[in-house]
Swiss-Prot record:
Residues the record lists as binding Zn(2+): H353, H357, E376
Organism: Homo sapiens
Signal peptide annotation: none
Protein name: Aminopeptidase RNPEPL1
Low complexity compositional bias, start-end: 679-690
């Protein structure tokens, strides 16, 4: 049997010992229908067959469990209407402490109906092999993002007695599984599929305890069409050529949402001693040149701050533009959208943020979705410590100022009393946790962590605390009180000073008060980069305009950092609508220059164009939307177009480009375009030729097209997908 090994264990590194999950039951999670509090999940095994022609995944799941109390009547798992369960079975665990993972038998392809899901093949044990017996099961509604799967258990089960539950299923139209036809990839050569589990989508990938409070190790065997490369978030992987299947194993406990898979026309290139990039062949040279050597630099900086990297390898896979978020911190294998490759500084920040998640989020995880700031706030703090170590304080302060500007912009939109501005957000039953993802999770969380670092008076001492915190809680899930108790225990002098009760800055108020952060970091070390931005913005808002424009045009922003230009454009966006003569002068001064910059800059300028109904530059908006297939670069423009007087223009561009968009993104844009149909779409001023034939279309015709065959499917709800960057 020929085996091509792709081991993710770092060369010469010893595997960190795996701590068993804590004995107390996991935290209660209202987003989960499961009975996770009654069981301990030890390991899960997946046998998966990818069927891109049918957009179907056929699976066999083997759960290794033990009950925490005697005679549990049933096992309840999170599932989804997209899952069709074929069978459930029970198997007593063998007497041996550790059993070789089971194999899976895959049906041979052929004409006729779709073959059944894979069958498990358990290893023969000495004596009589534990027999499988069928189990009754039922599926009940839970929320609009999932179902509950109840599996009846044998009555004689004892507490702490290991057993296995085997579930065979197929999954179609699953929110977690994104199927792409070849034409939606860069190379247009082979089909592509990826999964996105955060927050609660993986219940449509496989039945599970879909809560961050539960972690376990996993293994998987995956069969894919010939020539398709499969990758998973696993510490070890290998391809068995004779069998035509991929084998994966994750040796550290992870929550269900971090089990991830991607398959397509992917090729690897090493970029460091423990890192490689995977991408479509046409993207691989660019990805390699931008990240070669850099990832190892970031990992080494993180290790100096927070202790050894415990996941073996750190690989990155670049996904097609359909990927619904910017990046996802799947352990050992970060998923990142390929569109970000042209924006160097954003690429650096996004990858470093995912590196930071290796300690904060993946190793130590928030036990409930109500406290996502525990992962995102700490990861953002760690990200900025890493950038300070590698690129200096000025760059870090510039990036922080850019993000805090965005936070205050969101605060104005939501209002200071918005409950989602709390760090500890109360998740009501039925509400999708993905709705809680916002800038407060990241930036208000960061500000609180930064405040804690200032209390101890020395960033290095705070780094030492975080290092000890990770060592204590690695491979477990925690609540905010665990972090704060550990902080006060590590700094007893601060506990004696009752820093948690300082008037106006109480820890409880940080966690539960609405509104902006109670304190923000000192960003004066970045003034050399932020001061020119503020000066240029002030020039463009000064009078008389001709003198201001002349002074502004003397400033060469082509030499600025990307975050400086983005911050300047964001300030202009905040002031929109601007006087038409200002927009005209801005266009004359910057439009051609900005058109040659990366997409993060171009989209901001084009939003200014749209929000100010500046028709002379609409051709640039059209060209941008014709070239983009990414949610991050299309949704904001369509939302702005449909808010103002340019809805007809938006309809026309969408009709011409929809064939190149992923169905999920197409549905999202259709929902934006269909809102308010029936009201006038006539522009506020005389339309240019850019508005074309769409100006003559009737609202009823538009609505018929938007809500006809391409109407949103009940099987895929947009709110099922986390679209936060």
């Amino acid at each position: 049997m020929a085996a091509q090994c792709c081991c993710r264990q770092a060369p010469g590194a010893e595997a960190a010992p795996v701590r068993p999950p804590p004995e107390p039951p996991p935290a209660l999670d209202v987003a989960s229908a499961s009975s996770a509090q009654l069981f301990r999940l030890r390991h899960l095994q997946l046998g998966l067959e990818l069927r891109p022609e049918a957009r179907e995944l056929a699976g066999c799941l083997v759960l290794e469990l033990c009950a925490l109390r005697p005679a549990p009547r049933a096992l309840v798992l999170d599932a989804h209407p997209a899952l069709r369960l074929h069978s459930a079975a029970f198997r007593r665990a063998p007497a041996a402490a550790a059993e070789t993972p089971c194999a899976f038998a895959f049906s041979a392809p052929g004409p006729g109906p779709a073959p059944p899901p894979p069958l498990p093949a358990f290893p023969e044990a000495p004596g009589s092999e534990p027999a499988c017996c069928p189990l009754a099961f039922r599926v009940d509604p839970f929320t609009d993002y999932g179902s509950s799967l109840t599996v009846t258990l044998p009555p004689e089960l004892q507490a702490h007695q290991p057993f296995q539950v085997i579930l065979r299923y197929t999954s179609t139209d699953a929110p977690a599984i994104w199927w792409l036809d070849p034409e939606l990839t860069y190379g247009c050569a082979k089909p592509f599929v990826f999964t996105q589990g955060h927050s609660v989508c993986n219940r449509s990938f496989f039945p599970c305890f879909d809560t961050p409070a539960v972690k376990c190790t996993y293994s998987a065997v995956v069969k894919a069409p010939s020539g398709v490369q499969v990758l998973m978030s696993a510490t070890r992987s290998a391809y068995m050529e004779e069998e035509g299947v991929f084998h994966f194993h994750m040796e550290h406990p992870v929550p269900a949402y971090l089990v991830a898979l991607v398959a397509g026309d992917l090729k690897p290139a090493d970029i460091g001693p423990r890192s490689r990039v995977w991408a479509e062949p046409c993207l691989l040279p660019t990805a390699t040149s931008k990240l070669s050597g850099a990832v190892e630099q970031w990992l080494s900086a993180a290790e100096r701050l927070y202790g050894p990297y415990m996941w073996g390898r750190y690989d990155i896979v670049f996904l097609p533009p359909s990927f619904p978020i910017v990046a996802m911190e799947n352990p050992c294998l970060t998923f990142i959208i390929s569109s970000i490759l042209e924006s160097d500084e954003f690429l650096v920040i996004d990858v470093i943020h995912e590196v930071a998640h290796s300690w904060f989020g993946n190793a130590v995880t928030n036990a409930t979705w109500e406290e996502m700031w525990l992962s995102e706030g700490l990861a953002t703090y760690a990200q900025r410590r890493i950038t300070t170590e590698t690129y200096g304080a000025a760059f870090t302060c510039l990036e922080t100022a850019f993000r805090l500007d965005a936070l205050h912009r969101q605060m104005k939109l939501l209002g200071e009393d918005s409950p989602v501005s709390k760090l500890q957000v109360k998740l009501e039953p039925g509400v999708n946790p993905s709705h809680l993802m916002n800038l407060f999770t990241y930036e208000k969380g960061y500000c609180f962590v930064y405040y804690l670092s200032q209390l101890c008076g020395d960033p290095q001492r705070f780094d030492d605390f975080l290092r000890a915190y990770v060592e204590k809680y690695k491979f477990t899930s925690v609540v905010a009180q665990d972090l704060l108790d550990s902080f006060l225990s590590f700094f007893p002098e601060l506990k004696e000073q009752s820093v948690d009760c300082r008037a106006g800055l109480e820890f409880e108020r940080w966690l539960n008060a609405t509104g902006p952060p109670l304190a923000e970091p000192d960003l004066s070390q970045g003034s050399s980069l932020t001061r020119p931005v503020e000066a240029l913005f002030q020039l463009w808002t000064a009078e008389p305009l001709d003198q201001a424009a002349a002074s502004a045009s003397a400033i060469d922003i082509s030499k600025w950092r990307t975050f400086q230009t983005a911050l300047f454009l964001d300030r202009l966006l905040d002031g929109s609508p601007l006087p038409q003569e200002v927009v005209m002068s801005l266009s004359k001064c910057y439009s051609s220059l900005l058109d040659s910059m990366n997409a993060e800059i171009r989209i901001r300028w084009l939003q200014i164009v749209v929000r100010n109904d500046y028709y002379p530059d609409l051709h640039r908006v059209r060209r941008f939307l014709e070239s983009q297939m990414s949610r991050m670069y299309t949704i904001p423009l369509y939302e702005d177009l449909c808010t103002g007087a340019l809805k007809s223009f938006a309809l026309e561009v969408f009709y011409q480009t929809q064939g190149r968009l992923h169905p999920n993104l197409r549905r999202a844009i259709q929902q934006i375009l269909s809102q308010g149909l029936g009201s006038s779409t006539e522009p506020a001023s005389e339309p240019s030729t850019e508005l074309g034939k769409a100006e003559a279309d009737t609202d009823s015709d538009a609505q018929a097209l938007l809500l006809g065959d391409e109407a949103p499917s009940s099987a895929i709800s947009l709110r099922d997908v986390n679209v936060s960057a």
